[in-house]
């Protein structure tokens, strides 16, 4: 994600207070296992957890061990999220903002974050006059639909700094997890008919906008015009390409002979969105439209596999305007799996190659703290790791998305390992920061804490591990 204006100082101080050290906690075998593998024992101060503002009045999961760090970190994560529920000038209902330096919501992640928060509702004590997590989840979708332009474009972001009537937030498409997919999942939880009907109309128009303005080469795939389209700031994938679209207009491609690019992850987002639109159409009794969405989804899926996959590398790459692969092995390949582009049966050979050579390869993406944003053995891996870097750091956003695809491909044991690693790292450093070193699990310190995705990673993973 792109660096944004910091939260108001009062809110930053509130979040900082949540991260102050509590009494030293004993180091459990679970919380320290990742470090003892490297012969290191974390200091008690490094594992200091936040103190919740009020005693919890809702049940907690049955945590994997008796280590009190679980409960303390759990309460601290809930407090971070409560502090990040804000009202935007351009939308009347409170939303869950990104937190840390990101004072707003982004289409690539906010809908999923709202959804995950909604699934935690039974653990969140209701507060008078405050929205429930499911109400926040609804707002994290409806805010984007409310700001949709007449031509169908959805905003990439809506920020606390945006004034009413501003045209900000439309300078890139910045999508990863399809908003259509998360809104469908939310509908399955709430059976909110108004949400379903609004989402179906809005997401259909968004798909049409992308067809019109992001398929200039008429390939049927989705084109990337700038770095921020994919939210992969400072990734070598986009070296030499402008961060923003010209004139902050997502319809305009920069005048570069290698642009626009055919992007596998953006195309996968559209694929996942069309699958969700088909489900919505069926729920609305629009059976002919369901068939059309499924056919369109299969069409773009086929194009991703035939045009953007490199069998020799077992990786997915951008294809530039000169029909050359941009051979940077990035988290793009994992994003393809995130939308289930590979059929577990029909595409088993491709999946097995991708899994073995890239995703589960300890020299590539299966780092001690998965998943790095670039393969460990990728020559362009960026070190030392700067803040907000998709050039190598393991990002909380990528971790939060893992449960969307790993069980689908039968990788539950590996998901459990990933969740254990992330929970252990977060309990050591309970500031809830954006990213960490994939080799050590050390969070990037220049990133301020209070980052909603990191808090959600801990809460969602702790809950899932309690069922294991």
Regions found by a protein language model. Give the residues of each.
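Short amphipathic alpha-helical coiled-coil/interface segments
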Residues: 77, 203, 293-308, 422
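Aromatic- and glycine-enriched pocket-lining scaffold segments that form the walls
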Residues: 261-284, 294
């Amino acid at each position: 994600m792109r660096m944004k204006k910091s939260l108001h100082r009062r809110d930053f101080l509130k979040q900082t207070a949540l991260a102050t050290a509590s009494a030293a906690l004993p180091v459990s075998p679970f919380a320290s296992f990742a470090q003892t593998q490297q012969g290191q024992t974390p200091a008690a101060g490094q594992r200091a957890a936040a103190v919740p503002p009020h005693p919890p009045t809702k049940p907690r999961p049955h945590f994997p061990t008796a280590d009190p760090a679980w409960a303390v970190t759990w309460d601290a994560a809930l407090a971070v999220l409560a502090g990040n529920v804000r009202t935007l000038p351009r939308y009347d209902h409170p939303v869950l903002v990104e937190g840390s330096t990101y004072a707003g919501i982004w289409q690539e992640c906010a809908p999923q974050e709202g959804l995950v928060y909604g699934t935690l509702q039974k653990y969140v004590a209701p507060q008078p006059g405050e929205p429930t997590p499911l109400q926040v989840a609804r707002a994290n979708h409806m805010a984007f639909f409310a700001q949709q332009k007449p031509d169908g474009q959805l905003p990439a972001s809506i920020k606390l700094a945006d004034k009413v009537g501003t045209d900000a937030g439309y300078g890139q498409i910045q999508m990863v997890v399809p908003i259509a997919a998360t809104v469908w999942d939310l509908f399955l939880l709430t059976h909110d008919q108004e949400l379903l009907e609004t989402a179906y109309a809005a997401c259909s128009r968004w798909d049409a906008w992308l067809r019109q303005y992001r398929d200039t080469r008429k390939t049927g795939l989705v084109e990337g015009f700038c770095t921020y389209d994919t939210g992969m700031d400072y990734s070598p994938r986009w070296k030499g390409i402008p961060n923003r679209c010209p004139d902050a207009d997502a319809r305009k491609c920069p005048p570069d002979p290698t642009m626009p690019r055919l992007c596998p992850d953006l195309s996968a987002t559209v694929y996942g969105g069309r699958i969700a639109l088909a489900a919505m159409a069926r729920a609305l009794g629009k059976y002919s439209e369901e068939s059309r969405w499924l056919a369109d989804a299969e069409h773009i899926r086929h194009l991703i596999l035939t045009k953007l996959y490199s069998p020799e590398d077992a990786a997915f790459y951008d294809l530039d305007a000169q029909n050359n692969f941009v051979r940077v092995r990035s988290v793009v390949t994992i994003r393809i799996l995130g939308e289930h582009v590979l059929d577990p049966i029909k595409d088993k050979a491709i999946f097995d190659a991708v899994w073995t050579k890239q995703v589960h390869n300890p020299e590539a993406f299966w780092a001690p703290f998965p998943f790095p944003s670039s393969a460990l053995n990728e020559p362009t891996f960026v070190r030392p790791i700067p803040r907000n870097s998709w050039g190598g750091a393991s990002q909380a956003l990528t971790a939060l998305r893992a449960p969307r695809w790993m069980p689908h491909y039968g990788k539950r044991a590996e998901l459990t390992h990933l969740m254990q690693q992330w929970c252990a790292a977060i309990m050591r450093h309970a500031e809830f920061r954006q990213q960490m070193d994939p080799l050590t699990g050390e969070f990037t310190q220049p990133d301020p804490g209070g980052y909603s995705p990191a808090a959600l990673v801990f809460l969602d993973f702790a809950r899932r591990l309690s069922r294991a």
